[in-house]
């Protein structure tokens, strides 16, 4: 559904503006909750945009879930559309797990204080950060950008766009 939602958003803006458009749809998918909150991430608590209530509801839903079963991933679909209707949608993910409590930091929004990205490790040619069991909210913007679902989706779009455009 993320891809479908991204396409709907892109089509709407492209039709209104007459210009090529990029739109995304993203969310958090928790294994123990059968993928919820998923496409309803922004309104998981029942209304749109209440990060604190969404976090509280997620923590309550995960209260009895043991450490080894708290897998989750952020998912992003990015859609590029041309005024003629041709479009390209690319997906990105960041795997991780849900913390037992908020791991607040100086950055982030939404579920960032609850999401611990999988350790990316650090190698000589690897520019991704070692996440060291830090939440998204505890990573600097540059660290988060290097591993994020949106960053991964945009990198894939950048890779596929030239052939899509016939360049």
Regions found by a protein language model. Name each.
Residues 1-167:
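Anionic-ligand binding patches
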């Amino acid at each position: 559904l993320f891809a479908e939602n991204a396409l709907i958003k892109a089509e709407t803006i492209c039709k209104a503006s007459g210009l090529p458009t990029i739109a995304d749809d993203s969310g958090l998918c928790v294994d123990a909750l059968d993928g919820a909150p998923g496409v309803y991430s922004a309104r998981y608590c029942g209304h749109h945009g209440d990060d604190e209530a969404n976090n509280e509801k997620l923590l309550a839903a995960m209260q009895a879930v043991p450490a080894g079963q708290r897998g989750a991933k952020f998912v992003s679909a990015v859609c590029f559309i041309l005024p003629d209707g041709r479009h390209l949608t690319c997906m990105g993910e960041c795997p991780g797990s849900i913390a037992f409590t908020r791991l607040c930091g100086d950055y982030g929004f939404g579920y960032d204080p609850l999401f611990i990205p999988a350790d990316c490790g650090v190698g000589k040619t690897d520019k991704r950060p070692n996440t060291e069991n830090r939440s998204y909210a505890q990573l600097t913007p540059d660290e988060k950008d290097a591993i994020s679902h949106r960053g991964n989706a945009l990198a894939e779009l950048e890779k596929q766009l030239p052939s899509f455009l016939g360049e």
